A protein has these predicted regions:
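Short, solvent-exposed aromatic-acidic interface loops
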Residues: 23-25, 66-67, 107-110
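Conserved Nudix-box catalytic region and its N-terminal flanking loop in Nudix hydrolases
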Residues: 12-51, 55-58
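Class I (Rossmann-like) S-adenosyl-L-methionine-dependent methyltransferase catalytic domain
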Residues: 69, 74-81, 120-123, 130-131, ...
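Functional cleft and adjacent loop/helix regions within the main domain
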Residues: 31, 37, 78, 140-143
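Active-site segment of metal-dependent pyrophosphate-handling enzymes
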Residues: 54-98
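NUDIX/MutT-family hydrolases
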Residues: 88-92, 99-134
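Residues that recognize and position ribonucleotide moieties
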Residues: 28, 84, 110
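Conserved N-terminal beta-strand and adjoining loop/helix that marks the start
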Residues: 1-17, 90
């Protein structure tokens, strides 16, 4: 089975995180996508955030573990249909505005502070709750 590295980014602004309704899948997810050759997960997270939403993010250092990329709040794996298994690095990024410029992957979006009615895979809500509460340990890294 094919394996692909991917990223998900929970952008947050004024205590809420951005969720998009994925056109093809029909479920609420954070922005994200696959890593390009030679890209680090953090570079991919910043690129996907910018490409999908028009937002620029600052990725706070949220882990005390030396060598952990800024903004990394988790890792999960899921089957992505014909794309095989996505090995997914999950990030949080602070953004200065809630003005989203959607791309062709979604038309609906919303800023949420509760994940009780978000639906979709349980880990989307679990990671979303973590993104809302993750606190910086040191300096932010711009994406």
């Amino acid at each position: 089975m094919r394996r692909t590295f991917s990223v998900a980014v929970y952008p947050r602004h004024q205590g809420k995180v951005l969720m998009i309704r994925h056109k093809r899948l029909g479920i609420w997810l954070p922005p994200g996508g696959e890593l390009m050759p030679g890209e680090t997960p953090l570079e991919a997270a910043a690129r996907e955030l910018r490409e999908e939403t028009g937002l620029e993010g600052r990725f706070p250092v949220v882990s005390d573990i030396d060598g952990t990329p800024a903004g990394l709040i988790g890792y999960e794996e899921h089957v992505a249909g014909s794309k095989g298994i996505h090995m997914n690095f999950v990030f949080v990024a602070d953004v200065d505005t809630d003005a989203v410029q959607p791309n062709d992957e979604f038309e609906e979006w919303r800023w949420v502070d509760s994940f009780d009615d978000i639906g979709g895979p349980p880990n989307v809500a679990q990671l979303g709750r973590l993104a809302v509460t993750a606190r910086p340990r040191f300096n932010d890294v711009s994406g």
